[in-house]
Regions:
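Sequence-pattern detector for short linear motifs
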Residues: 99-100, 108-111, 119, 184, ...
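Conserved phosphate-binding/catalytic loops in two-lobed NTP-binding clefts
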Residues: 85-109
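Short, surface-exposed amphipathic charged segments that create phosphate/polyanion-binding patches used
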Residues: 105-119, 137-141
Length: 196
């Protein structure tokens, strides 16, 4: 699962565009696998960055917040990246359109992140852009919140899935076959044991 947040300004003080990739396990833990931040106004760069992350992690869904001009970018991504040469879906796009009833951006981030961090259900990798995310998480009013916002979008996605609990020796063979069928349908990530 991934989420993508768009920013249109190249100004140093403005937020950056961001992609966050997460994985999950059967205990409902969330693993931040990768983060990329960049500034651009070019639609082709949005596509290139997402294609690079998809190639690296092979996630099935990307959640994109769609407001104003972002709709055009998401449609471009759907046309260019979402299908292979045979027209089969390679990457599914979830359009997120926050409304008044969803609360402010800060309320949405708090609702998605605070309970999971309080329950110690979110794990970070070391180094790289994770330090930027961690700074945004601990500051009350960070100068930028693009990584935090994108992580909240991924975690609160309606497309986020958790794998089934591993089978024990006592459980019957039918449930083992069902687990094997489900496992084949999802991209496994060996380092963390969940799927993307």
């Amino acid at each position: 699962m991934a989420a993508m947040d768009f920013a249109f300004s190249l100004n140093k003080r403005s937020d950056s565009s961001c992609i966050v990739v997460i994985g999950t396990d059967y205990e409902r833990n969330i693993y931040v696998l990768d983060i990329v931040r960049y500034k651009t106004k070019k639609t082709s760069v949005y596509l290139e960055k997402l294609a690079d992350m998809h190639s690296k992690w092979n996630f099935q869904w990307v959640s994109c917040e769609v407001t104003q001009a972002q709709d055009t970018i998401v449609e471009y991504i759907k046309d260019e990246l979402a299908k292979d040469k045979n027209g089969h879906a390679v990457l599914k796009i979830e359009d997120r359109r926050p409304g008044r009833n969803d609360g402010s951006k800060q309320e949405r981030m708090a609702a998605a992140l605070e309970p999971r961090y309080e329950n110690k259900q979110v794990y970070h990798y070391r180094g790289g852009m994770i330090t930027v995310l961690e700074e945004e998480l601990v500051m009350e009013h960070p100068p930028h919140d693009d990584c935090k916002d994108t992580l909240a979008m991924a975690i609160s996605s309606g497309k986020l899935r958790y794998p089934h609990r591993p089978q024990t020796e006592d459980e019957d063979d039918d449930s083992q076959e069902e687990l094997a069928r489900i496992a084949k349908a999802h991209t496994a990530h060996g380092r963390f044991g969940g799927y993307i």
